């Protein structure tokens, strides 16, 4: 079935990047549950995204599926939302709600008057739409998959 094939493809991709099988399994169950009513067959890959949103020091690849848009963020050393994406969005800080999973590298997310948090490989994260900033930590590219907020991020 389509949901099973989609989940298998997603599992293989994430498993090649993350070794925590419980987290990978949970993400795939989410996808399976979301698409259990689908009758048609859809398989997409980030190697051939529907859209690429490019900005200084990074890019955001988008694949569109019925009822869901999934994004893959790739940010390079020195990337910071308020410097690199803010000029494109017209807001000082990110106001997009996120649900995703860190694949590689590390990034900090910071809200005003709250302790910053670091997201790394294997972390399943939720970030509210309260204005926040984010930046790459270290020298490695930060890569994450986004299941919520992808339709409007950096658009």
Question: What role is predicted for each listed range?
Answer:
Residues 72-93:
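Conserved short histidine dyad/triad with adjacent acidic residue
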Residues 129-153:
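Ligand-binding loop in jelly-roll beta-barrel domains
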Residues 1-37:
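N-terminal amphipathic/basic-hydrophobic helices that include classical n-h-c signal peptides
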Residues 92-108:
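Short, conserved beta-strand element in jelly-roll/cupin
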Residues 113-129:
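Short acidic-glycine-tyrosine-enriched beta hairpin
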Residues 27, 31-74, 82:
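A short, N-terminal "cap"/entry segment at the start of jelly-roll beta-barrel domains
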Residues 68, 76-82, 104-107, 153:
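Short, charged/polar surface micro-motifs in flexible loops or helix N-caps
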């Amino acid at each position: 079935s389509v949901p099973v094939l989609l989940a298998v493809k997603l599992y293989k991709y994430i498993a090649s990047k993350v070794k925590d099988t419980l987290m990978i399994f949970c993400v795939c169950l989410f996808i399976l549950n979301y698409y259990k009513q689908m009758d048609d067959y859809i398989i997409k890959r980030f190697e051939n995204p529907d859209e690429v949103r490019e900005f200084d020091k990074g890019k955001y690849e988008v694949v569109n599926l019925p009822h869901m848009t999934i994004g893959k963020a790739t940010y390079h050393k020195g990337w910071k939302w308020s410097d690199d994406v803010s000029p494109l969005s017209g807001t000082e800080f990110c106001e997009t709600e996120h649900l995703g999973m860190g694949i590689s590298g590390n990034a900090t997310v910071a809200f005003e008057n709250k302790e910053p948090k670091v997201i790394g490989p294997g972390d399943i994260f939720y970030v509210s739409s309260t204005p926040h900033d984010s930046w790459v930590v270290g020298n490695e590219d930060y890569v994450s998959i986004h299941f919520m907020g992808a339709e409007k991020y950096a658009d």
